[in-house]
Amino acid sequence: MMPPLVLGAQTGEDILDMCAAPGGKTTQIAALTQSQAHLTACEMNIPRAEKLEANLHRQGAKNVPVMRIDARELDEFFRFDRILLDAPCTGTGTVISGNEKSLRGLTEQLLGKCARSQRALLDRAMGALKPGGTLVYSTCSILPQENEDALQEALDKHMDCELIPLDGTPSESETRRAQEAGEEPRVECNALTEAIAAGHVSSVANGMPGTLTIPPSRDFEGFYIALIRKRS
């Protein structure tokens, strides 16, 4: 799965998977860090938290505490080097074209509920980052209300956080640094930017350059992903 690869977690770091059940991305982070990071998973739904714990055990992910709380109410005490927020959403990226049954549950009420929750989760996630820490925000939706609109609102509130582009362009702070130093700006690369450059993944334009909307295809369900860093 792409979000844990973009997160780029390292051994020894404090890492949070905010909406972790059923645990596929959590176990991937544990594997990528060889269980040598301080990884915490969060899930407020008790049956889903129990399934998460069972999956972590089954996959051999060691020393991953599961907090059975609403991540929107995460204590101010907590601070993390990296946070993965794969937020609950309408799932429009998984809708099958022409399949009316797959559209049946998509209502304005559901969209509004998801959008409110996503904004609260983003607000808490940005607040819980350490200086220099990074956040991956992803959904399996392709609707702007759940993606770039929600993210822009959070960035407007958290002025100490900035977008790290995933489209092969430098960030604003890197552009300024390079200009002051008389250098070419550096572009941060990860598995997703490399896959796009190689033509393995296609994205479509959205309302926030630097974030990616991946449309549904034979190879992928549709999803949205963005990378944010809190300035040091």
How would you name each of these model-derived features?
Residues 1-232:
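S-adenosylmethionine
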